[in-house]
Amino acid sequence: MRAAPFDFFFQSTALSTFFILCSLATNEIPTISGAPAGKIVQPPKPNILKQGCPSDLLHSRALRSIQLACRTHPATVISAFEGVQEGLQNCANRLRFQQWDCSEAGNIMHDPPLLRQGFRESSLIWALSSASAAWGVATACAQGWIDDCACNNQMGQNEYEFGGCTHGVQHGITASRKLLTKVGAVNTLLRKVEKHNLKAGRLAIKKTLISSCKCHGVSGSCQQKTCWKRTATLEHITDYLVEKYARAKLYTDDSVVKTTDLIYLEASPDVCKAKSVAGRVCAWRNETHTQGDCDRLCCGNGFSIRHEVVRVKCDCEFVWCCNLVCKDCIQHRWISTCNGTPPKSLIF
């Protein structure tokens, strides 16, 4: 069964907490008590970035560049990998009411079957993986957790200028290109489409950049302003690429496409025949028969409705200064899920 939207947000990989904190930190970096004016202290590096690459990446057969980078820049590879994982989860949440929902696409660093085909869905996974890898590395850079990133001040002080880190964005984009682009591969039409969509993903990072500024001066006056570019949230980047996916273009040798377009080579197989929809949560009261409608989402296999009683936090309020106090409430839920049979294909 698919998780409810808010439950889904908290079901993530080993670095989910790291990325949540990073997103908060890069959006509004707090002043650390006792730190010099205009300075912030770098947050400690998460243990997962200190442990080196796991064996599946260290011995990856899909991408030779992953193997090499694991030996020289493991923190970069792990940040990219976890960024991709986070991106796939965002995609599954974003498309949870569509028949194909990213949930079984697989991480690009593991060479999933979907990326050996030129489907419309493949174009989204290529682009989203590329963008998410760049986002993961840029986010880690902004925190000073990657040693060779220009954002990390290695001058002997565990602090750096409050001015944001535009360098981290470019470092993330460069890392994504080097890690995910296959070098020396056969120059087939599929490979051309793959490279195009990977680049479109990297461009999505640039297209969604956000400008941030901080004023410097006495009593909050803006005598001097420091501005920098930072990455958007991964949710926003995912939304941007999902919209591109909806308008993806069929590619031929004489096609004229923009570098930001997603492109594909062949029609997708029927999702209802290619994969199982059993357990998918659907909207059985959807009278408009649009997104999430059980009749459409369940491919005509029918659906089941069950009643759940869950305990949730409610009526939350902050108690000065820093405690969040909530009541425990009982909530009744009627959940409809698709019936179905095992999948007939491993592609989706």
UniProtKB/Swiss-Prot annotation:
It comes from the Eukaryota. One of its GO terms (molecular function) is frizzled binding. Disulfide bonds join 91-102, 141-149, 151-165, 213-227, 215-222, 272-299, 282-294, 298-338, 314-329, 316-326, 321-322. Disruption phenotype: Cell fate decisions disrupted, protein localization altered and neuron translocation disrupted. Defective tail development in males. Defective in egg laying in hermaphrodites. Nuclear localization of wrm-1 and lit-1 appears disrupted. Similar to tau-induced unc phenotype. Deviations in vulval precursor cell fate are observed when knocked down in conjunction with cwn-1 and egl-20. Bivulval phenotype when accompanied by mom-2 and/or cwn-2 knockdowns. Increase in ectopic synaptic vesicle puncta. Keywords: Developmental protein, Disulfide bond, Extracellular matrix, Glycoprotein, Lipoprotein, Secreted, Signal, Wnt signaling pathway. Ligand for members of the frizzled family of seven transmembrane receptors. Affects male tail development, vulval precursor cell specification and egg laying. Involved in morphogenesis by influencing polarity of asymmetric cell divisions of the B, U, and F cells in the male, and the T cell in males and hermaphrodites. Controls spindle orientation in B-gamma cell division during male copulatory spicule development. Involved in specification of the P7.p lineage during vulval development. This is Abnormal cell lineage protein 44. The gene is lin-44.
